[in-house]
Each structure stands twice: as C-alpha cells, then as structure tokens.
C-alpha cells in the first residue's frame, strides 16, 4: 500500500496550516473570553460563524467526506493529516464543518439516506446551517457491543413510536442540534445483528428530553457536550427510517469505522 499523501492532500495541508496561522490561533483567546463573559456554558461564540465563512471561501469545507459530490473526495489516508492539524485547537474542526458527530451523521445520510432525507437534513448539515447528534449508547447495557441495545422503535401504522434512554449523546445539548440519528430495536426476533434500525428524530419532537449533561474528568464540554437523553413515546414518520429495518448495526459499523480512525488523529498533534 502506498502511504504517500496525494498532491491534493498536500495542497490542503498547506492551505489549512496557513488558515490556522491567520485565523485560528489569533482567535483562541477571544473564543474562550466570549464563553466566559457570556456566563452561559452553552454559549456559541460568534467568531465561529465568521471563521466558517472564511473557510468556505477557500474550499476548506467538508474535508472529511470521500464523496466528491460533497467534498474534496479524500481517502482516509489523505484526510488524516488534516484532522491532525485541526486537533491543535479543540474547537477548530467546526470551522471547517468537520466536527463530530456531524461528520459521521453526514456520512450515514450520504450513503444510506433517501433523496427526501438528504434534501431535508443532509443539505443543511453540509452547508453548516444546523448541527446534529447520534443516540446509540445506553446507560443500562454494555453498548460497545451494539447488539445489547435495548431501546425500542415500534411500528404503529405510518409511524414509529420510540422509547429509550441514551447517554454520551454528543452534541445533543447544542442549541443548534436540530436532528438526531437514533438507534433502537425494530425486529426483536431477527438474528442479533439484524434487530436494530436507525431513524431520524427531530430534536424538537414531543417526548425528547435532555436529562443531564455528562462529565469527563470534571468537564462537560459546554455546547458540544454528551448528555443523557430520554425518548418517551416519541412519534416519527416511517419515512425517517434510514436504510431499511434491521440495517442499524450495519450502518453503525459503516459510520464508526472511519470516524474512530479520524478521531484518533485529532488529539495526536498537540502532544508530539
């Protein structure tokens, strides 16, 4: 296997490093100061939106997507050094629309979503107009094995009724998170890897409740935090199903593989 970076990746690395020198590093203090002075841990500094517009102008946008219709079409190998650079400042990945969990959610919608789902949710995510969350991990089971997931997605005519508790639901507490990808059981009698499905749940749907923020070593990560979320008799149309009933585990594997790889690159640079 050739581990050399493509010319496109090298050019993007140079452009990204220049952007950091000119825009990211000079705004680190102002970013922290804006949150501190607001007195609101969920405050989103306006500088983020300003920097996003600058990034869009020079095509430093949606760098993670291998689909050339939505991004530069980089392989995981070519994207890795870009993720390493973004890891130098913890909030910078959002400037380039490359932050979790939106990256994995956009990959799901790009690969498995219907045309309607892409128009309603993928497009505004790609444009950076909204943010999203991913609800898979549960407090009552060992969720690293997704076959243990116990939340239910029950058919009811043209709708699904969703019940369950999730936690470490990254970004669910974000005021701009408008859509959630929820994983639960639709087909309990199927083989273990074919019981789960994934559905789109708008965060303003009745029955969706943020229970509490979760803390990691004392930090709650503010507006990008990972809260516990309760879904109680949440009703969504069946058109919100992604990839068909029983496809949830397969979709989760497709999502978590590349995302885990790129997440590992993010924290490497500051410590080498």
Specify the residue positions occupied by each region the protein language model found:
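N-terminal glycine-rich flavin-associated loop
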Residues: 96-116, 145
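Single conserved hydrophobic/aromatic residue that forms the stacking wall/gate
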Residues: 263-272
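Flexible, small-/acidic-enriched active-site or ligand-binding loops
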Residues: 148, 206-234
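Long, acidic (Asp/Glu-rich), low-complexity accessory segments flanking structured domains
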Residues: 234-250
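A short, Trp-centered hydrophobic/proline-enriched beta-strand micro-motif
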Residues: 128-137
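Amphipathic, small/basic residue-rich leader segments at the start of a protein or domain
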Residues: 1-99, 116-120, 124-127
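A short core secondary-structure module
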Residues: 158-159, 163-211
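A structural signal for short hydrophobic beta-strand segments in well-ordered beta-sheet cores
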Residues: 151-154
């Amino acid at each position: 296997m050739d581990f050399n970076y493509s010319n496109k990746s090298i050019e993007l690395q140079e452009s990204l490093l220049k952007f950091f020198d000119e825009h990211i590093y000079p705004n680190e203090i102002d970013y922290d100061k804006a949150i501190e002075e607001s007195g609101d841990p969920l405050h989103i500094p306006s500088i983020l939106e300003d920097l996003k517009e600058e990034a869009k102008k020079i095509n430093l946008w949606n760098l993670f997507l291998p689909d050339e219709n939505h991004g530069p079409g980089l392989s995981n190998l070519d994207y890795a050094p870009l993720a390493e650079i973004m890891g130098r400042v913890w909030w910078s990945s959002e400037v380039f629309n490359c932050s979790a969990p939106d990256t994995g959610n956009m990959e799901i919608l790009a690969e498995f979503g219907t045309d309607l789902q892409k128009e309603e949710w993928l497009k505004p995510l790609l444009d950076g107009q909204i943010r999203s969350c991913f609800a898979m991990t549960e407090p009552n089971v060992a969720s690293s094995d997704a076959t243990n997931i116990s939340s239910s997605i029950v058919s009811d005519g043209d709708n699904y009724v969703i019940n369950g508790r999730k936690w470490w639901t990254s970004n669910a507490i974000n005021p701009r998170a408008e859509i959630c990808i929820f994983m639960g059981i639709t087909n309990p009698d199927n083989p273990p890897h074919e019981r789960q499905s994934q559905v789109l749940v708008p965060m303003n749907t009745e029955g969706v409740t943020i229970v509490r923020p979760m803390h990691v070593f004392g930090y709650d990560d503010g507006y990008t935090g990972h809260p516990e979320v309760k879904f109680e008799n949440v009703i969504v149309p069946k058109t919100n199903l992604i990839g068909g009933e029983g496809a949830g585990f397969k979709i989760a594997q497709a999502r978590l593989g590349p995302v885990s790889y790129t997440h590992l690159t993010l924290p490497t640079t500051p410590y080498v």
